[in-house]
């Protein structure tokens, strides 16, 4: 059996509109928009990256146009992302005023975590591990 080499994993977050989610990643966390695909007057797809992590956004309308089979299976569920950071305090300061869905906590597996709901409705847990 051949060995499969997985190179990376990038989440695709489906939203009604991409634009409200962009400041969360760009202005607050420093990611850059590296790819964008317009869909009429708005964005239909966007890829954000800082060289280490990537997050893709696609509108539900664009998904329906792109792949009816995938769209038929989309139920509107929201994703949960887990992102490791070097400084949880700096992260919390950068996201001051954003909706916290999991208050800062210490875990049994050695991390300090805090969870947010980004403007598209998806959940993002940020974690700093003790080194």
What are the residue ranges of the model-derived segments?
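Short glycine-/small-residue motifs
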Residues: 123-126
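Short, conserved charged micro-motifs
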Residues: 20, 88-92
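Vicinal oxygen chelate
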Residues: 1-12, 32-83, 92-117, 128-131
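Conserved active-site tyrosine of GNAT-family acetyltransferases
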Residues: 21-26, 95, 118-121
């Amino acid at each position: 059996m051949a060995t499969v080499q997985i190179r990376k994993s990038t989440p695709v977050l489906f939203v009604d509109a991409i634009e409200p989610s962009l400041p969360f990643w760009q202005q607050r966390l420093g990611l850059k928009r590296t790819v964008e695909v317009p869909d009429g007057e708005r964005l239909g797809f966007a890829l954000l990256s800082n060289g280490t992590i990537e997050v893709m956004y696609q509108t539900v309308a664009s998904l329906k146009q792109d792949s009816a089979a995938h769209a038929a299976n989309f139920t509107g569920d929201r994703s949960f992302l887990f992102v490791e950071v070097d400084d949880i305090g700096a992260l919390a300061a950068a996201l001051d005023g954003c909706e916290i869905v999991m208050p800062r906590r210490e875990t049994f597996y050695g991390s300090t975590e805090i969870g947010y709901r980004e403007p598209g409705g998806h959940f993002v847990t940020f974690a700093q591990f003790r080194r």
